């Protein structure tokens, strides 16, 4: 997945926090993902709705493709679709709380 704003980000040294906050500025979605958005993709793939799927490369990354060195789409200033926060145990990383 792309950069997900869970408490796992807090394990990085504080010297890296600013870079982790800013990494999404160039991404098409303009925000970090949520644990619920990752789990929603997993739930879909495990559901009857995906019964005819035999193989897939499903990128749940907000347009940030690791290892590619760039983005497929250009970010639009001020555009950010609302996050799906359907996972009741999700906690936002401290470094993203402002």
Q: In which residue ranges do the predicted regions lie?
A:
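A glycine/serine/threonine-rich, flexible loop-to-helix segment
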Residues: 3-26, 68-98
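Catalytic "switch" loops of ABC-type ATPases
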Residues: 5, 48-49
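Residue-level recognition of oxygen-bearing side chains
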Residues: 8, 37-40
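A conserved structural motif in NAD(P)-dependent oxidoreductases
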Residues: 27-38, 49
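Hydrophobic "lid"/C-terminal helical patch
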Residues: 42, 46
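Short, small/polar-rich loop/turn modules that mediate ligand/substrate recognition or access, typified
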Residues: 53-55
